[in-house]
Amino acid sequence: RDFHADNIMVKNKTLGIIDSQDAIKGNLLYDVASLVDDVRIKTNNNFKTSLLKYYLTKTKKIKEKEYVMAKQDLSILSIQRNLKILGIFVRLYKRDGKINYLKFLPHTWKLIELRMNNEIFNNLKKLLDYAVPKKNRNKMNFNAN
């Protein structure tokens, strides 16, 4: 749940992970989604695709020939994760006064929109466009309760 670039450290040319107390078993692509669509780090689409393909060639759990399905799973997980992050960041602002998380909201919306390029998300797109119109997604007005 908390796997992202800030929790990966390099020591003596070896990768290590910190802050792993919330680790749980789940979909194999959840951590990949967390890395390629990290709301705090902007990466280009080539990097995202390369990382997914690299992961698929290194793991024995998912075959590279299942790339299309893996890419769809990655989109589902990324959208779910980033919608949750939107809620968490707004809650941290409203409840705790932590304004610094608000700067990540526009990029989080961009990541969600990027991943909704599959027809399976058509209804979700309509719902989000109704609930939070695109013109309002970069505004920082959270005064309504």
Functional labels for PLM-detected ranges:
Residues 1-32, 42-46:
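Active-site acidic catalytic loop and adjacent metal/ATP-binding pocket
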Residues 5, 10, 25-26, 49-53, ...:
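Glycan-recognition and catalytic cores of secretory/periplasmic carbohydrate-active enzymes
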Residues 22-24, 79, 98-102:
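A short, ordered amphipathic alpha-helix with a cationic face
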Residues 28-63, 76-96, 108-116:
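Active-site activation/catalytic loop segments of kinase-like enzymes and analogous catalytic loops
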Residues 64-72:
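Histidine/acidic-rich helix-loop-helix segments that form or flank divalent-metal centers
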Residues 87-145:
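ATP/Mg2+ or Mg2+-diphosphate-binding catalytic cores
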